Amino acid sequence: MEAVAAARRDLPPGGPVKTDYVFQGEGADGAPTDVRLSELFEPGKDSLAIYSFMFPRDPGDLTPGPPGGETAGLPLAEGPCPTCTALLDQLDGAAEHVSQKLNLAVMAKAPLARVLTFGRERGWRRLRLLSSAGNSYNADYLAETPEGAQRPMLTVFHRDGDAIRHFWSSELFYAPTDPGQEPRHVGTLEPLWNLFDLTPEGRPLNWVEQFSY
């Protein structure tokens, strides 16, 4: 595992971002505000990880939506992805620790009001939630298909002086999977699936994360 991490750290610099993307976020006063990609880098922290949250979900995902709250009133196809939600439930708990050394943000194509409302309904308190509804970020970084369907990508950027460059993305999502397995592009991040991997039973078959049990 360390050998893979070392090889990743030794990757050559990626391409510079083509624009200083403008996202929508929540200001200190609680009002919507524009946030540039460059503003997601805090002093002394030159790496930024952005998780592209599938909100709206994949059109073929028929998993039941949230059982209550304002988000439950959305058409299923416009609602959030339950698998992404499970990952973000876990990242919210780790975000305070992560943010000591790394900038972290969660991006969704849904309007900001929907993203923030759902975050409150899930009890997320530490994740920085943003909307990319007004720009091409998702399409530019493999988090959106040409048809507009959202994809769950984790993308890392690095700041070098005044330049911001792409460093790494979870492109393993697009690689062929082992028989009967889901993509493991961000699998090392999730306690949920890694705990299953430690058991004699392994990962449960024919089971997916739900909004409520």
What are these regions (language model features)?
Residues 99, 103-131:
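Conserved segment of the thioredoxin-like fold in thiol-based oxidoreductases
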